[in-house]
Amino acid sequence: MRKMLTAVLSHVFSGMVQKPALRGLLSSLKFSNDATCDIKKCDLYRLEEGPPTSTVLTRAEALKYYRTMQVIRRMELKADQLYKQKFIRGFCHLCDGQEACCVGLEAGINPTDHVITSYRAHGFCYTRGLSVKSILAELTGRKGGCAKGKGGSMHMYGKNFYGGNGIVGAQVPLGAGVAFACKYLKNGQVCLALYGDGAANQGQVFEAYNMSALWKLPCVFICENNLYGMGTSNERSAASTDYHKKGFIIPGLRVNGMDILCVREATKFAADHCRSGKGPIVMELQTYRYHGHSMSDPGISYRSREEVHNVRSKSDPIMLLRERIISNNLSNIEELKEIDADVKKEVEDAAQFATTDPEPAVEDIANYLYHQDPPFEVRGAHKWLKYKSHS
């Protein structure tokens, strides 16, 4: 009788697991719902207390973060491939290796908050809500791109995301302006203004620091310190590489930018600081890019292959999260491999769209220059050629 009952139950459950929803339900029963994780303490400047040194990671959060980071990694590697196949032309700056920054920052703020960054923007485009399809299509200059094929790699925009900016450091005072708008409107929102260590010595950055401190603007200045500004190491370009201290009277913190949980908790802390009316704060994210500065830079003339390999093998952000997930029984290798396969298909489908979607028509070149009805004559257009639509 017992053998018969066992056989029946085995048959029932084997049939159930063929259905994805039930399979997911059954698999989740053997995993922990959450785990308390220790994270590295941040270095503080002009702060008595900083972010916590432990945090709770739920299973749902872990799988979401893992998938998002894998999407960004595969999307950037696909962009590398499309560039080499000449589907992508012009400038192209990839962020593989820095995924914990993109995902951790978004996890620490609200969708209604604001983000502005430099030309290394693809990952932030995705975390701000743009699809892989629209990002890759923008890279290939197609109509289905997030900027209708007119912005390319460096000029992508989305809801509460202001680029993608091509001039080194130029986005920082713009971010201070967005923060000024938040304070003026009294909406309780903050702006994350990101820049690299190469831009950290720009004069306009310090001007933005000053005005933000003077007016107590809700701006989180974030230096993504990946150790190199183009091909120059930060030790050769900066008298001090303590970027979290460069705000002078503005408090700051230095964060392990390869650990998504460190980034998330530091971002929450910084955003709360700004929302409380204390003014701006500076965050330095210690991170690393695997590619060169851009696709025209092989990235090995100013650093060794051994250096890159060492970072990949010891500090890769996706690897660190995967190990944390498995060690805390939030998932297993089999489930994570299923996510990997799903991500691979999503990126491949997006790449297919990005290489077959039509390019914008020539007649469309003067469209979308103005928000509302523009003057009939459009500056920069051929003086003998007038387009039917300019809006």
Swiss-Prot record:
UniProt catalytic activity: N(6)-[(R)-lipoyl]-L-lysyl-[protein] + pyruvate + H(+) = N(6)-[(R)-S(8)-acetyldihydrolipoyl]-L-lysyl-[protein] + CO2
Subunit and partners: Heterotetramer of two PDHA2 and two PDHB subunits. The heterotetramer interacts with DLAT, and is part of the multimeric pyruvate dehydrogenase complex that contains multiple copies of pyruvate dehydrogenase (E1), dihydrolipoamide acetyltransferase (DLAT, E2) and lipoamide dehydrogenase (DLD, E3). These subunits are bound to an inner core composed of about 48 DLAT and 12 PDHX molecules.
Protein role: The pyruvate dehydrogenase complex catalyzes the overall conversion of pyruvate to acetyl-CoA and CO(2), and thereby links the glycolytic pathway to the tricarboxylic cycle.
Pfam families from the UniProt entry: E1_dh
Claim: Mitochondrion is one of the keywords in the record: yes
Protein name, entry field: Pyruvate dehydrogenase E1 component subunit alpha, testis-specific form, mitochondrial
Binding site for thiamine diphosphate: Y119, R120, G166, V168, D197, G198, A199, N226, H293
Alphabetized UniProt keyword annotations: Carbohydrate metabolism, Glucose metabolism, Magnesium, Metal-binding, Mitochondrion, Oxidoreductase, Phosphoprotein, Pyruvate, Thiamine pyrophosphate, Transit peptide, Tricarboxylic acid cycle
Phosphoserine: residues carrying this PTM: S294, S296, S301
SUPFAM superfamilies cross-referenced by the UniProt entry: Thiamin diphosphate-binding fold (THDP-binding)
CDD domains according to UniProt: TPP_E1_PDC_ADC_BCADC (cd02000)
Intracellular or extracellular location(s): Mitochondrion matrix
GO annotations of cellular component type: acetyltransferase complex; catalytic complex; mitochondrial matrix; mitochondrion; nucleolus; pyruvate dehydrogenase complex
Signal peptide: none
Organism per entry: Mus musculus
Positions contributing to Mg(2+) binding: D197, N226, Y228
Positions of disulphide bridges: none
